[in-house]
Amino acid sequence: MNTLSEHYGLLLGPDRSWRVVDVDLSLEEKRVEIRLEHVPGTPVCCPECAGQRPLKDHAPQRQWRHLDTMQFETILTARVPRTECPDCGVKTIEVPWAEPHGRFTLMFEAFAVRLLQAASSIEKARVHLKLSWQSVQRIMDRAVERGLITRELEEVKHVGLDEKSFGKGQDYVSVMTDIDGSRVLEVAPGRDETAADVLWNIFSWEQKEGIEAVAMDMWQAYVNSVDSHVPDAEVVHDRFHIAKHLNEAVDQVRRAEHKSLMQEKDETLKGTRSLWLYNLENLSEQKRAEFELLKEAELKTSRAWAIREQFRWFWDCRSAEEAEVFFEEWYLWASGCGLKPVQKVAKMIHKRIENILSWFRHRISNAAAEGFNSIIQSLKSAARGFRNFANDRTRILFFCGKLKLLPESASH
């Protein structure tokens, strides 16, 4: 029959250079402590140059959190040998059960990563793991570091640039996505040209040459950054942002007209905001019937809505050439409508039309980036005060980056 030390030695599976020498079970603390020892006489190698070197001494005792044993917290302890390398100096050797400077075993980190990915919230995973927020953050930091090292960017052809409100007041982050891969590539604080420049640093010059198009809002800072880093890529102004601008114009007209009507005790537009902003197909039959009567009224809001609706057909054109003809006719109507919010958006689109017509060549948008919004907002609200940009970035890449997060030797 195996002794307890031999039993744990088989379960842990350390290489032959290490052995379990003692197992301490505390029923009161619900804790198992496993003491490992480097087998005397076993060769040691410098972790820097991998050369076999003489043993100098042993570092002070360290401990690592391991997978629980029958729901008992399990800790590995060891004094790790140090080598004396003529080239690299005195170095502590690597251990087979944990990464350098880690406080958790590879198996525990792999379990924690899988649990974080599967749990509905970081807090629930943290409670189950019986860890502090700081410890969970360190595990996520290390997982993202591993994932970024092995991430492949050679096949990225279509990139999205978008801004997200991610803090109090007017705090923003800039987010870069791989549109075809539906993943977040990088996050930078701010939404200016400097922030966008930081995002491009993840690519080599060879990888940048492979990027064909970039989807974004009509934000000049992002356009400038694209021109600097990927001058051969086409800018594609995102159709969903354009729709947002047109919606805002309709709403501005409605609010101004509603205020004017209410001064005359006319409540025609009261409570109608959603009717003007929703697509007809998303309205209930009752609401659609109400709206059919409303939009036939002699209202400025009706005209603004009609202009917005007409632009939706722009995206159904079969080519950029056909779309350009369509736009010129639409622009004559929109620019001459006498509704300042609509005219302002029409002029903005006219100014950027070349980067809008490019959609017909690439047909990309930031729809995937918009899909990450709910995840990013939930991460923001769940941080419980343990927030700074570095932590925010880690969490976004952890959950939205499609990275290989598991330790290599524990990923099976």
Residue ranges of model-derived segments:
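Acidic/histidine-rich catalytic cores and adjacent linkers
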Residues: 43, 48, 54, 168-171, ...
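Conserved phosphate-handling catalytic cores of large alpha/beta enzymes
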Residues: 248-267
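A residue-level signal for conserved active-site and pocket-lining positions in enzyme catalytic cores
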Residues: 34, 125, 349
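Flexible, active-site-adjacent loop/turn segments at secondary-structure boundaries
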Residues: 10, 74, 93-95, 164, ...
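Tryptophan-centered motif/residue detector
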Residues: 18, 64-67, 96-100, 133, ...
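Short, conserved DNA-binding cores of transcription-related domains
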Residues: 1-90
